[in-house]
């Protein structure tokens, strides 16, 4: 959800994911709102991608986790398109791409099917690579055809800022 507080926009991506898990499914509406704000409001984009706040990483992480959870959902095409365009817009920022080097919380990694056994850690870049690979390779091509260009462009935009992906990201 997005709220304005004392003139500053704060992104609360975690609440989107929590509501998704509760079955209220506002994910598509949240993705549409994020896409519209990121495309039409430069101040919002600057705030979300600001290295001081790093608000884009939780937003992207929540969207990637929901995309991964909806791999088999044939009705999630609209959500996947909105989420992929949000990721594409965020990837235009070098600060956001650099922030993807941060270590992903184990709970987030588990939602993407990434192993955390033995203290193994993954970066947000690893999670993004894993989810994009799963979406583009494990789903029916006719469903994911509109997502190929934005998702591959997202990876291409962000990759130069990554400090070496982990085992999952480099596989």
Predicted regions and their residues:
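Acidic, Ser/Thr- and Gly/Pro-rich intrinsically disordered linkers and low-complexity segments
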Residues: 1-22, 63-75, 127, 131-139
